[in-house]
Structure formats: structure tokens, C-alpha cells
Amino acid sequence: MFKLIRRVISLILAVVIIIPTYALFVTWNAAKNPGVNTSADAIVVAGAAQLNGAPGDVLLARLEEAKRIYGEKYAPLIITVGAGAPGDRTTEAAAGRYWLVRNGVPKSKVLSIPVGRDTLTQTKSYITEMKKRNVNKVIIATDAYHCNRAITMAKDFGAEATCSPSQSGPNTLENSRYRYLIREAGAYLAYITLGRRGIHISDHLTNGSLVRYVHDLVN
């Protein structure tokens, strides 16, 4: 009986340590090794905050990265995604498209999909559009620590996905704080355990909420 209890305790401890460690590792690894070395059908700019049509620092960095790899002929089309927050006069997608066109990308090469204020909804929206066009290879321009979750969702919906992390702004690998890594690891765990089962998890949970979620998951 004592041996059984010890084994159960050992298993619980292993789960408590292994699951969060795995999530942290895959999130960190995707950030360090994004794997953008082949061409794609489209570049997707993950939505982020804008103010009266002007991209915020995070969105601007993602747009700059998308423009950079578009200029290097990685893909013939850029897709901007993202709805607006309540009270906004425009959307993340529209602000992104406007910036790209204003900075030299032809209008015909930028598609705006003003849907979703979270990664899952945005992913569904652009995958639906890509399927209509009979294409499935995508490069996601986003923050380094967001790469793993964004890629995972895209692959779950049938895309061949890679990520090109922002090279500037507050969320580069060098500038990001560990709490962003922890938050993304927690959000990834929430997605693979609940999101894949149709239970929607908001991107806008606080770090504290995610920590409580991970604690409940592994206990």
C-alpha cells in the first residue's frame, strides 16, 4: 500500500513538473527556432492593438516583419487580421492594411479580414479564406513567444505553418520578459487541453488567471 501511494505521489509530482516544463520549452523553442526557410502562399499578420488607425508598437513590429519577408519574396500575399475593440473607429486588420499600403505594398497584395480579437478566432478567419483560395502554406508574423501557439492553431486547422518573429518592438525575444513566456506557455496549455475541445479561452486572461488555470489543470 505504501509503495502504491508513493508511486501515485511520484506520478502527480512528475505531472506537475513535466506538463508546465513542456509547455515552457515548446514555447521557448518555437521563439528561438521559427523555421522560416521556405516560401508560402501568404503571410499573416497577427492582430494587435491600434489607436485610431495607427498601429500600436506591437502591431507595428509585426507589420514591419511582414513587409520585410514580403519584400524578400517569401509569399505573394499579406493577410491582416483582427477586429476592433468596443468603441474603436476602425479595426486591427484595417489599420494593418493601411500601414502596409502606405509603406509600399501594392493594394492588390494585401487582404484585410476584420475578424477576431483573439488568436483562435483570427486563425479560423484566415484559414477559411485560404481554403477558399485552395492554398494552405502560411508564415505568421507575430511576437517570438506567440509563435508556438499561433503555429499550433494554424496546423490544427490544416495549414502548413511557420512563424517569422518580430525583429523590433517590445516583444522581440531580447526585449520580452519571462512573464510573457509564462503567459504564452499557459495559454498554449489552455488551448491544447480545452481549446481543441471547443472550449474557448480568451487571449486576454491575466497572468494570474493563467497561473491558476495551470495549477488547476495539473492538480
What are these regions (language model features)?
Residues P86-E92, C147, E184-I192, N207-V214:
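A general structural signal for short secondary-structure boundary/capping elements
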Residues I199-N219:
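Short linear elements at protein peripheries
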